[in-house]
Amino acid sequence: MRQRPKEQDKIERRHNFNPVEENLTPEQVKEEASRCLSCKNPRCVKGCPVNIHIPDFIKALKEDKLDEAGEIIRQTSMLPSVCGRVCPQERQCEGQCVLGIKGESIAIGALERYVGDNTAAKPVEITPTGKKVAIIGSGCAGITAASDLRKAGHDVTIFEALHQFGGVLRYGIPPFRLPRTVLDREIETLKAMGVKFEKNVVVGKSITLKELKDDGFDAIFICSGAGLPKMMNIAGENLNGVFSANEFLTRVNLMHANEESSATPLRVGKSVAVIGGGNVAMDAARTAVRVGFEKVYIVYRRTEAELPARLEEIRHAKEEGVIFQFLHAPCEILGKDGYVSGMKFEIMELGEPDESGRRKPVGTGRYATLDVDTVIVALGTGPNPIIQKSAKTEGLDFETDKKGYFTVNEETRETSIPTIFAGGDVAPVGTSNAINAMGAGKKAAKAINEYLESLK
């Protein structure tokens, strides 16, 4: 039987930001590891974007070799404690596990998290190459690339636009899913390796790509994320009480705007509608519960079966009292005296599948309203063009797609301008999540290292 971690009481956790799940116990780890079949052709490894040697680290756990398990994971993943908590394992490694065909897959994520939390990265002997790499952004892609490039001996500097490091791991994912102590430990590991960190540096404003090159950086990896929110473009979006999920989560996670002592306090109303069905929508809704909204709705234009969020996130949201309104498409945000007073929706039904493979919502001509005083829009984000615009004034004209994302070689992550690479949410390939960003960081680091090696 699959082992499951103990969870914080669903009523208590509505009122705090403490982690919802505990680690598995050592006994549970041993029991879960014993279920692994040690397949000769492990599908789970193919399902992992960074190709962690999953059967090998689980075998080490079977043999009570915890430190060895940590070494195996860290051969390919810098962030086991992070990935064990936030990666969509049910759609990746665990989704490929043969045991899941007729029963329950191995709890790979929980095992990885346990190993990450209970082992430390060993010191690495660095042989300096004299080459310099600039990494723009300190999220998953940047941290991963920095680790690999530093191990190869290169002088690595990470430039972060905000005042704390971690990117979306810091400002986007709430601490009840990813404790800040976990993220801080990973950052400190990089610093101990000799990676340099510069905060409050907006590349394209504070410094340009050309200036970085002039400062002696031999290669640049752009992984600054996608920070521009996608809005609904409906009437009422300019009313007070309308937030993008990006703003709402950043204000709570990074600026602590929910606390009384905050210099920029968050206005908490009675009821909020969160528009969207992904993990960000779940994070926003569950955060809204914790900051004090009495009623929290998630409004989604399809049915529960089409929700793209992790199953665990959906379950936790329901347990915490979030109300789901399915087959509702926003039409208008209603207002009174400049503030949100409600929302109008069209009732939908499902038609034929669209390009995503999900059945397309079709309007019925019937309408409904919700009494809410706050709206949080969680419909995704797009790239900020500041780097491209700044570069263009210096004669660096990047190729981008129609949405503004960098066009890159999928294997090397190199942009249309030689020696400049891009990955993560600024040049997404596949679903946008932590582990895919890490995969992009590894590809970029490999290509950058090969280029720098060729200069010798």
What are the functions of these language-model segments?
Residues 112-127, 185-205, 229-291, 400-411:
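Glycine-rich dinucleotide-binding loop and its adjacent helix/turn
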Residues 238-269, 353-430:
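FAD-site-proximal beta/loop scaffold in flavoenzymes
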